A protein has these predicted regions:
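Canonical radical SAM enzyme core domain
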Residues: 1-36, 43-55, 71-83
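Radical SAM enzyme [4Fe-4S]-AdoMet core and its adjacent flexible, acidic
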Residues: 39-51, 58, 62-170
């Protein structure tokens, strides 16, 4: 399987064509709403990037590339679970990644507490479940894996198994 992660900021048409031709899964970082994304991911000149990233996702999808949206859940994202779900649900495949503090023990402006992450997951799961019951299913990797495990199936996420194979990182 070929997979790559990108911030989605500057992908050329040639690179997108390559991903399509070689059947890559592309994970694109989009941290919720434009407001929450732009807070942590401005460009080098300090300008917002959410609209550029959203256009890149559309270009990838139009080319037939499989796309997962990767959303880092920090303290700001965690305050807006419903808005974040609504912003990302149209992309259908979402991975939420908690933003943990470093090992230095320093708390930062964007730090995510365990309580805030739990509240985010609970409200997001309610939205996920509602979308499913209304016939608008969205794949949220953690939820999909936890449900599979509760049903006695193994998770597809190797981290939830406790062992991952080697990956080439460039």
């Amino acid at each position: 399987t070929n997979a790559v992660q990108t911030n989605g900021y500057d992908l050329s048409d040639e690179m997108i064509a390559f991903f399509a031709k070689e059947h890559f899964l592309v994970g694109v970082s989009l941290d919720g709403t434009a407001q929450t994304h732009d807070l942590m991911r401005p460009d080098a000149a300090g300008r917002p990037t959410a609209s550029v990233v959203r256009k890149t996702i559309e270009r990838l999808r139009e080319a037939g590339v499989s796309v997962n949206v990767l959303c880092v859940v920090n303290g700001e994202v965690a305050k807006r679970p419903s808005e974040v779900f609504d912003a990302l649900a149209p992309y259908e495949y979402i991975q939420f990644i908690p933003c943990l503090d470093g090992l230095d023990g320093q708390t930062r402006d964007y730090s995510l507490s365990g309580e805030a992450y739990l509240a985010f997951l609970k409200e997001t799961f309610d939205r996920y479940h509602l979308a499913y019951t209304e016939g608008r299913p969205v794949s949220i990797r953690n939820f999909d894996n936890w449900i599979a495990m509760l049903m006695g199936m193994p998770p597809e996420n190797c981290a939830m198994v406790g062992r991952c194979g080697p990956s080439l990182v460039i």
